[in-house]
Amino acid sequence: MKKKLIAAILTGAMLVAGMSTSVWADGEKSFVYGTTGYSEEMGDAGLNPHDNYSGWSALRYGVGETLFKYNDNMEVEPWLATDYEFVDDTTVKITLRDGVKFSSGRTMDAEAVKECLEDLIAVHDRAPYDLKIDHIDADGLTLTIYTTEPCPAIINYLGDPYGAIIDMDYGVQGEGGSANVAGTGPYIAENVTPTQIDLVKNENYWGGEVKVDKVTVKSFADGSALTAALQTGDIQGTYGLQYDNYPLFENNSDYTINSCATSRCFFGQFNMDSEIMQDQNVRKAVEMGIDKDGFCSVIMQGRGVPAKAAFPSSFSYGNDAVETVSYDPDGAKKLLEESGWTDTDGDGYVDKDGQKLSINWLTYPTRLEQPKLAEYAQATLKDIGIDVVVNNTSDHMTIAKSGDFDVYVSSTTTAPTGDPEYFFTSTVTGAKNYGNYQNEEVTKLTDQLHQTFDKDERSKLAVELQQDILDDDAFFFVSHLNMGIVTKPNVTGMAAHPCAYYGITPSLDVMYMFVENKILWILCFL
């Protein structure tokens, strides 16, 4: 009623001024959000948290919530839970929040959470190893998890998006990129496709008033199209803007930029089964031939920090704790020469036994800077005599799994749970180890990290593990990224977060009206 009254007053005032208007014609607030971070090729399309990385979308777009979440300092806090206690090394007792309902209408209790977690570990690729769940007891609002072995990071992992609590009685409606679920979040998905999600506010949300009535999430595969949509007003906010497009919106009163440092990193894996890449001198030469400082300053426009290893300097086990090679074209050429690679025919590329040194660089387009990184590396590696053939494809996952590459460059949030373990268990020794890197000591240390409770010891193990993979030249790390959300200035309640899990929240609010296709900002609070 209040919104309709104010809308009517404003409409009348503008009609007196002779201006045509369309002011919240249905009395509702709406918000259109554009992103390059939602797609089938990224593995996060659909809203089923038990499928690949779709839990990220369930959390980001306000449909799902986890038992625990991370604050701005990446410290674990209760969310759907209110407390927890380690009874012993293999038993944790969790108290659940009272008064929470799924969007299906079912009350969330320990039995519902048990059903959800049991389905998760039955079907997910990472969760069983991370959580080590043996069995679960449910009693009212008390959930007791028993693990097969000590699992110090279980509370952190229960904040991973795959841990979004959904109603298994409601089940999963649809498949893959069209999957819909009943969560506990501030929004309910009415329609889900691999390219768009239509949301309405949850009128019975346990966490208070939800301010915006309808939200549309639109996926953009093309960065230029995303930028244009923000400029024309087709969308009101975005995550995933090309970094070289930020100057269009900086120091511009028509937009607001909110950003923060994250552990998201552009990094590469060498294919250890590739004959060329089995030569460590070649791997090291590739690393020494990439100008990380130049990439961060020129391509990233200063919104990235050169990376030594998996974690940024804000972590005690981050960049400053490890050593690796730096940009050194002359040193790279010497390494290649040591392995018999020289330019015998004067074409600018080194060769051996009549074969030019050519590497297959696999990447994908939805992380908009990755193709640019490929082009940048193509140019700098040419300077040391290496030919780079870029395969920039949305089908990168299929190719990565097949092993048809020499270098696979992707991006990941290396510490999304505020703990170092995730990167090693998922990417170095786990399912995302597409380069088939094998090192018994690294596997042993990863297992040790998985069972270590002491935080200082966990940090030491993280440093040792990073140094091992750097010394083996199995991975290389290019840049740690800042996360930025760009919105129209009448949009409030959207903030960048270090783990990039949280986007559409109950705090989101919009104040606007359209006047002859121009937005008149209403600087007031209802």
Predicted regions, residues:
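Structural transition elements
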Residues: 306-344, 365-371
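Aromatic- and charge-enriched surface segment that lines or borders ligand/interaction sites
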Residues: 82-123, 276-278
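Detector for C-terminal structural segments
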Residues: 196, 289-319, 369-378, 400-526
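Gly/Pro-rich hinge or "lid" segments in bacterial periplasmic/extracellular proteins
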Residues: 53-54, 75, 159-210, 214, ...
